[in-house]
């Protein structure tokens, strides 16, 4: 806010840490940006809301600092008195002020990260393509070997609509405007007049942000979510995916002096519009709409690029030679303009544009720039790219390679990566829905049989027999239930999409809560019904099991072994290039067994799956269903990929990106490029370089098994075995209020109960983040370490310290926990505990949580041999510490509003205040879901 409120240096409120001068200089520039934005926001608040609101914000902030730093009881009483004295409208104004400061501080921090990326650009470092290629060279891997690796590689970020981004798109658009202005300030040398004009622009942007609704008034539809997801293609993917390929291609060609094109390996995926698991609003019609929106975005981008390319390629025939193929392409163009008669490249581009426009019309897209004349539509993206290749070869052959390496190169690569469909849309549904659908189909087709009553082996035998049968299972003369008709309609829509866009438009059919071989065969049979699996044993779609619970992870290798032993299924895998994808669920396994056990069972499942797939001679591709928060598998992607067991990556990886994580990673082109580079570099390193390192020692695995067992017992003991825990959870968190936020199209619970088992993982994790406990990201660790050291009194702690130093998996596990605990606050959490009306229950459960929190922090510090949390990550430590003075007040206000909301009749203004605090706290935490 103004110089009176916001510019205080929160870093100075803690004991200073000795750091290198470069880091201090980084901090100074970051603080300059925060001060500037804070001053502008403060002036805006004073102008718009008055001096009184302005002063109260400062009092709350200062008192909150005392409470957080010292757990000061007088500060707590003073804070409660200030908040009690506020009217609801003033409370809302104050919440908005603190929330927007968190948003603006995030922008400044992002800009600082971009500054660091630019400073390090081109230098070999972990997570960079340059660093990874240098590492590969150092261990004797040639450029040609790397080209062969990428020819069979797949790196696929998959965007999902999991509802963890609480900001409206309008808010994000305004914030991107502020970010763009900060970037301009960074890049340009301005005169005094330009500096003043620039600040005026910032003031306009911040004022507009202040006067923009922070909350959505209506619930998002699925197609709204699709449109939001597509905006990141404009910001990042459509340009940065081709650029990353170009960077790698150039580096490899520089290494060995060749001039070879690199195979495209980075492919985008999406769940938005195809994920039906628990979302009744994703129908066949919605899926059709999602595919249309995706394709429209891709074709419009290509048409715009062709229009620009036509302007650029003003090459005259009498000044430069052209190839025969190019001349033929120009002659076929419907462009009859005399102005371009001697410009063969422009004529060729006009013809290509006309054919692509005809393709768009064939796919029933409107609102495109009119072509110069009628033309034949392209049959597929390969035909379109073949014409672009003619331009490329002609330029190369006639000494114009520098032109070929510009916009044309980027466009050719984009077509190769995005096709006409933009991203492969995954279909996902719960295995229970497939089971009910198959039951209805089989019971109608085979009177007297009861599919639901059959055991697993009987089901496998029946489904395998049906797979070999040439007759369809569904009948047009049977009146099926609504659910079955809906599922059949979705599969038929998938078949139609394949006919319209090609086989890459929908490549995966994912089975949530997969518990057996029959769950897989049911989906194969549904694909066969619509022609996506044929009688010759060819499948147009990968059937992907999703193993989510601890029990299912433990059973996963056995299920896949049985499945790959079935001749009828193995034929389908062979038809897909001998690759079988398996998805692992981080969220539900965490909710089921806790952070430590979830991480360990996922690791063990991967080890066992690698063995099974090697035995069957099938290539394993793992799809990691990670969330944004550590409690849902989040954390740095580079570390997570390198921490995988040997053989688990093997050149292919898919990974979910969702909600606030999509925004933070891909709303800025440079940041997007960096994150794509990290995924590519980590996949290469984990596949080619890490296998050369030795596997973890047996005693490491034994120790982790013991830790997991102890942690599982502690976690389950609290969450599932403590009487009254569900009541405590629902009373001490904002779980009820989260459902009112309109942040996604999907319901928060699978069933209308208060059972933890029925709650989705996102609201579970989100709720614990809001009350600043982050319990899913650490609970059980302290008890596990205490029990382990007690069993190994002589060398237990020293051995765990060795594990941390030597084993990437354990190091990554603890590093993520370090970050989570640094964001937590037991003092603030104690205020949420007071919302529980039963004092005995409150003291019993919060007492256990508090003891485990202290024990987990101490265990973590002992193993990492640190004096404080995040000691080994000073940049993140500073970042989190900077946020507390503006984040903590939102928690205090939220508690007071929750008290009022739950003790009186529903007041929309109070509820709106709670929703605003949820928004602001999420912004301050950055990865809360």
From Swiss-Prot:
**According to its UniProt record, which cofactors does this protein need?**
Mg(2+)
Q: Does the keyword Cell wall biogenesis/degradation apply?
A: no
Q: Which reaction does it catalyse?
A: oxaloacetate + phosphate = phosphoenolpyruvate + hydrogencarbonate
Q: Where is the active site?
A: 162, 591
Molecular function per GO: magnesium ion binding; phosphoenolpyruvate carboxylase activity
User: Pfam families in the record, alphabetically?
Assistant: PEPcase
Q: Does the keyword Magnesium apply?
A: yes
Per the record, the GO terms for biological process are: carbon fixation; oxaloacetate metabolic process; tricarboxylic acid cycle
Q: Which InterPro entries match?
A: PEP_COase, PEP_COase_bac/pln-type, PEP_COase_Lys_AS, PEPCASE_His_AS, Pyrv/PenolPyrv_kinase-like_dom
Q: What's a single GO CC term here?
A: cytosol
Recite the UniProt keywords alphabetically. Answer: Carbon dioxide fixation, Lyase, Magnesium
Question: Which Enzyme Commission number(s) are listed?
Answer: 4.1.1.31
Q: What does this protein do?
A: Forms oxaloacetate, a four-carbon dicarboxylic acid source for the tricarboxylic acid cycle.
Family from the record: Belongs to the PEPCase type 1 family.
Q: What is this protein called?
A: Phosphoenolpyruvate carboxylase
Please state the gene responsible for encoding this protein: ppc
């Amino acid at each position: 806010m103004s110089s009176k409120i916001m510019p205080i240096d929160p870093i100075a409120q803690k004991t200073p840490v000795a750091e290198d001068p470069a880091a201090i200089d980084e901090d100074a520039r970051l603080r300059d940006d925060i001060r500037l934005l804070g001053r502008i926001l403060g002036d805006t608040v004073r102008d718009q809301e008055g001096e009184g609101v302005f002063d109260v914000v400062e009092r709350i902030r200062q008192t909150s600092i005392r409470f957080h730093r010292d757990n000061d009881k007088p500060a707590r009483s003073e804070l409660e008195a200030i908040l009690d004295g506020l009217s609801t409208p003033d409370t809302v104004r104050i919440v908005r002020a603190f929330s927007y400061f968190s948003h603006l501080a995030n922008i400044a921090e992002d800009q600082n990260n971009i500054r660091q990326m630019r400073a390090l650009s081109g230098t070999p470092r972990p997570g960079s393509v340059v660093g990874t290629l240098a590492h590969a060279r150092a261990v004797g891997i040639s450029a040609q070997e790397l080209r062969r690796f990428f020819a069979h590689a797949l790196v696929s970020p998959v965007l999902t609509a999991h509802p963890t981004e609480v900001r409206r798109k309008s808010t994000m658009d305004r914030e991107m405007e502020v970010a763009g202005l900060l970037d301009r300030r960074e890049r340009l040398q301005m005169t005094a007049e330009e500096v003043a004009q620039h600040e005026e622009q910032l003031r306009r942007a911040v004022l507009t942000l202040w006067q923009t609704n922070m909350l959505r008034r209506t619930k998002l539809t699925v197609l709204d979510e699709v449109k939001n997801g597509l905006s990141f293609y404009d910001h990042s993917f459509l340009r940065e995916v081709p650029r990353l390929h170009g960077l790698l291609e150039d580096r490899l060609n520089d290494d060995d002096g060749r001039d070879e094109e690199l195979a495209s390996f980075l492919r985008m995926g999406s769940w938005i519009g195809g994920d039906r698991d628990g979302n009744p609003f994703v129908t066949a019609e919605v899926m059709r709409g999602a595919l249309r929106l995706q394709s429209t975005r891709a074709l419009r981008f290509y048409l715009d690029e062709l229009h620009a390319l036509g302007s650029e390629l003003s090459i005259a025939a009498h000044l430069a030679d052209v190839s025969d193929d190019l001349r033929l392409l120009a002659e076929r163009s419907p462009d009859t303009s005399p102005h371009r008669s001697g410009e063969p490249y422009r004529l060729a581009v006009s013809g290509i544009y006309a054919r692509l426009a005809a393709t768009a019309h064939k796919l029933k897209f409107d609102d495109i720039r009119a072509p110069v004349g009628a033309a034949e539509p392209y049959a597929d993206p390969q035909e379109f790219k073949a014409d672009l290749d003619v331009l490329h070869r002609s330029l190369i052959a006639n000494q114009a390679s520098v032109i070929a390496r510009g916009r044309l190169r980027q466009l050719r690569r984009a077509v190769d990566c995005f096709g006409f469909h933009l991203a492969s849309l995954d279909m996902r549904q719960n295995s229970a829905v497939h089971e009910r659908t198959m039951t209805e189909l089989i019971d109608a087709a085979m009177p007297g049989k009861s599919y639901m009553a059959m055991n697993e082996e009987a089901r496998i035998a029946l489904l395998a027999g049906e797979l070999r049968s040439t007759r369809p299972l569904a009948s047009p003369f049977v009146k099926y239930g609504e659910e079955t008709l809906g599922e059949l309609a979705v599969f038929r829509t998938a078949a139609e999409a394949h006919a319209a866009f090609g086989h890459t438009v929908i490549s995966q059919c994912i089975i949530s809560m997969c518990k057996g071989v029959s769950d897989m065969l049911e989906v194969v049979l549904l694909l066969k019904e619509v022609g996506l699996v044929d009688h010759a044993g060819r499948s147009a779609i990968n059937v992907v099991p999703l193993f989510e619970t601890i029990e299912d992870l433990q059973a996963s290798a056995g299920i896949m072994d049985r499945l790959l032993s079935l001749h009828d299924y193995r034929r389908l895998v062979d038809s897909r290039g001998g690759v079988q994808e398996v998805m692992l669920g981080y969220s539900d396994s965490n909710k089921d067994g806790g952070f430590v056990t979830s991480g360990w069972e996922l690791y063990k499942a991967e080890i066992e799956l690698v063995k099974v797939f090697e035995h069957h001679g099938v290539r394993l591709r793992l799809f990691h269903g990670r969330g944004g928060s550590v409690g849902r598998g989040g954390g740095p992607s580079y570390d997570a990929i390198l921490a995988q067991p040997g053989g688990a990556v093997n050149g292919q990886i898919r990974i979910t990106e969702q909600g606030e994580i999509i925004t933070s990673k891909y709303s800025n082109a440079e940041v997007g490029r960096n994150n794509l580079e990290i995924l590519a570099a980590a996949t290469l390193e984990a596949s080619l370089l890490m296998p050369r390192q030795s596997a973890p020692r047996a005693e490491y695995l034994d120790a982790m098994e013991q830790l997991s067992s102890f942690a599982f017992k502690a976690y389950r003991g609290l969450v599932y075995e403590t009487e009254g825990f569900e009541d405590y959870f629902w009373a001490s968190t904002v779980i009820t209020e989260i459902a009112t936020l309109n942040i996604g199209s999907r319901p928060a619970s699978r069933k209308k109960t208060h059972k933890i088992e029925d709650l989705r993982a996102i609201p579970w994790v989100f709720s614990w983040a809001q009350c600043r406990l982050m319990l899913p990201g650490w609970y059980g660790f302290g008890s596990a370490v205490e029990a382990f050291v007690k069993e190994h009194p002589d060398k237990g702690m020293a051995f765990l310290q060795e594990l941390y130093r030597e084993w990437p998996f354990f190091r990554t596990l603890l590093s993520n926990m370090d970050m989570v605990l640094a964001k937590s606050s037991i003092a603030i959490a104690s205020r949420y505990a007071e919302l529980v009306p039963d004092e005995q229950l409150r003291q019993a459960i919060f007492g256990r949580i508090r003891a485990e929190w202290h024990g987990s922090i101490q265990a973590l510090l002992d193993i990492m041999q640190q004096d404080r949390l995040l000691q080994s990550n000073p940049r993140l430590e500073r970042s989190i510490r900077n946020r507390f003075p503006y984040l903590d007040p939102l928690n205090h206000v939220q508690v007071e509003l929750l008290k009022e909301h739950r003790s009186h009749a529903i007041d929309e203004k109070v509820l709106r205040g709670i929703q605003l605090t949820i928004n602001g706290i999420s912004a301050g935490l950055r990865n809360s879901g």
